[in-house]
Amino acid sequence: MSGKRVVVGMSGGVDSSVTAWLLKQQGYEVIGLFMKNWEDDDDSEYCSTRQDWLDVVSVADLIGVDVEAVNFAAEYKDRVFADFLREYSAGRTPNPDVLCNAEIKFKAFLDHAMSLGAETIATGHYARVRQNAAGRFELLKALDHTKDQSYFLHRLNQAQLSRTLFPLGEIPKTRVREIAAEIGLPNAKKKDSTGICFIGERPFRDFLNRYLPTKPGPMKTPDGKVVGEHIGLAFYTLGQRKGIGLGGSREGSGDAWYVARKDMASNTLYVVQGHDHPWLLTPTLVAADLSWVAGEPPLAGASMAAKTRYRQSDAPCVVDAADGDMLKLAFAEAQWAVTPGQSAVLYDGDVCLGGGIIQSAQ
């Protein structure tokens, strides 16, 4: 691989730093690129952008690679954040990381990398890419299934995967930390980032309240009994237990309360008691806005596995239909709190086939 130019997305974290080091050891000409995807609150107690950039510079200096910063904030607000607000306004719970990967990290970033003369890009994602016997590129789970991030990458297409390297896909996370310590990376003990990137560590409701108005309404049980008031449907997600404002049962049971449904027309939030309440369990779902890694949908009747949220175990299912921009899945066992706005992602073993945005569950 000597001399081939690769642009590595460097965030200031351990994973992308080790990625850059590994590729340099393999003989690549490595250029580090730091993406600034959010303009606001640079001086906020919750914003780490400035420190992240300083970490990138320190790592680049240590391992001997050139690094630059590029601002994709305008693209991010237009392609990702606007959709995020639309989805919450409609009562759904989006996953902006999925859209960010497809539109920013593997589109705007990829285009910029190609303008720098790179042949490929690389990121610190835990996933794998391989080319099969037919010449198509496949997206696979990372060998370390506990850290696998293929769920967030399922919208990547053939052109994107053909130009992408995921060096950490073959390495356990524990080994990545060991490498960082062994080579003396200044950020070797830095915590992994969690949550939505533009929200950071700030309270989610506080952030969302800056952009969406609160519209209080009744909180009801399935039989119509009013048990409280919600602050606005956008501020709740299906399966949510904390932050509802209800203690034990009004009828004496100590079971926890969960958000079960949202009725946008009447501005009603329905809550139920007990983790396994029937309203939280659904055997089928419908998804739209589909994207398939190979460019083609699976055949109706095919037995697959699916995730309806990150970190969920693969759930056996059958493809009831995959026509045009509509996917219907029937699960072997009813799934818990299937949430409109989240992604339903299909797998055939370790191979990620793609998926779509959940529209409804029944």
Curated annotation (Swiss-Prot):
One Pfam family recorded for the sequence: tRNA_Me_trans_M
Keywords assigned: ATP-binding, Cytoplasm, Disulfide bond, Nucleotide-binding, RNA-binding, Transferase, tRNA processing, tRNA-binding
A GO cellular component entry from the record: cytoplasm
GO biological process, any: tRNA wobble position uridine thiolation
Enzyme class: transferase
GO molecular function: ATP binding; tRNA binding; tRNA-uridine 2-sulfurtransferase activity
Binding sites annotated in the UniProt record for ATP: 9-16, 35, 124
Region annotated Interaction with target base in tRNA, chain positions: 95-97
HAMAP family membership: tRNA_thiouridyl_MnmA
Family indicated by similarity: Belongs to the MnmA/TRMU family.
Name the record gives this protein: tRNA-specific 2-thiouridylase MnmA
Organism, scientific name: Cupriavidus pinatubonensis (strain JMP 134 / LMG 1197)
